[in-house]
Amino acid sequence: LVGSEMCIRDRIYDQALYRVYIEKGKFDYLYDKVGLYDKLRGVLCHQVSAAQLTYCWQSVDGIGGKMLNFLENHDEQRFASDQFAGDADKVLPALVVSSMMNTGPMMIYFGQELGERAEDAEGFSGKDGRTTIFDYWSVTTVRQWYDSGRCSVSKLSAKQKKLRNLYKTVLNISRLESAIVRGDFFDLMYVNGENPSFNPHRQYAFLRKYGNELLVIVVNFDDRQANVKINIPDHAFETMKIVSGKYEALELIGGDKEMKELSPEIPFACALSGYGAAVWKIELKNFSKEIQKK
């Protein structure tokens, strides 16, 4: 409850009932546990192909803005726990997809941005990769950040500080970029399934666009570096009103700038580190101005 407004959210295990709960139950948001969360976990644990992430947005098409995405909560095992990814540094591709695939909110569970591993054997809960909800307990990483009420990073390790800054960067992109907050979405996987310069089982790519701002988003769930070349079909150029040409592009996570070619004939080239991601922002109006000058 915030002021006079109440936000109602819940988790439903049957996706067929999502629309009923939203339309008739008047729920503001639903946790997409059995959709996006389960698929992302499956990809990270090498149980599911990244290509299956396409089904996640398709199954909630039209209500994607009502999905509350997450990578951790009170019931699930911590991302960095041995029972899940085993290392908080593997989070970037999943975090980017979860926070940028649709217009809905992203939830961060306490201590997630610090790489909490839930290694304690807490009372009733035991050592199960979760932070107990049954016992009075003090979570080490959160206690370090709380720092006796100072709420500072002074007691965090270098790795924790780096991870926290990464979360800050990605979440601010998803919060501030109009293409993500209210823009259109275009999945690129259907034209890259047999692409020799793209592994659809370990990489995922999509577009977001609002006005003249285009984001080319690609993630790598593999531990090896990948130099990918992504096919962008004619249909994307037509439906999103993209003009082919060379553009100056800014990579929003790392800050790199490059000239990128947008064309249905020439694949979009992108270098990705292991468990990396890239969010290339292109101002389409720049190209139009160049044409006008000529």
Locate predicted features.
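A generic structural motif
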Residues: R9-Y13, K241-I253
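C-terminal beta-strand-rich structural cap/linker in extracellular carbohydrate-active enzymes
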Residues: K260-K294
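Loop/helix patches that line or flank the sugar-binding groove of alpha-linked glycan CAZymes
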Residues: D38, G42, A51-T54, D61-N73, ...
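Short, flexible loop/turn elements at secondary-structure junctions
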Residues: I12-D14, E72-D75, W137, Y210, ...
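Short, surface-exposed recognition loops and adjoining beta-strand edges that mediate ligand/DNA contacts
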Residues: R9-A16, M189, G193
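Short, small-residue-biased leader/transition segments that mark boundaries at the very start
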Residues: L1-I8
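Glycan-processing catalytic domains of CAZymes
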Residues: R11-I12, A16-G65
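Solvent-exposed beta-strand/loop surfaces of large extracellular or lumenal domains
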Residues: K246-P267
